[in-house]
Amino acid sequence: KKKKPNAVATKRYKSRFFLKKGQVVDILKTEDVVCIRATSGVLSAYDNHGKHHLLTGNSMTELEAQLDPSRFFRVNRSEIVNINYVLSFESYAKETLAVNLQHMSEPLITSKTRTSDFRKWLAT
């Protein structure tokens, strides 16, 4: 019998997005993504230059599973944030927070069900 290796397989997370624009494919590194937002089923990544890019081929849930959970957190049903761009947060409404991000003009609002986990995630 062959022995199974003891090494634990480490999951590899998405490190870049391919953005097709006509015949050209641009590359957006995940480290440059400030947040991802779904609007009417269309996903957009907002980068650290204030630009947004359409993402195709994934649902929000599928995309969330491909991103490193130590760096990305889904704050509500339609938005994911990158921890490296969180500037501050403040109480917003009952059990929700307004999260201020670099390069974004308006805060993102956590859902009631994710607020507690968001605080824990930021503290790790």
For each feature predicted by the language model, list its residue ranges:
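Basic, polyanion-interacting recognition surfaces, primarily
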Residues: K1-T124
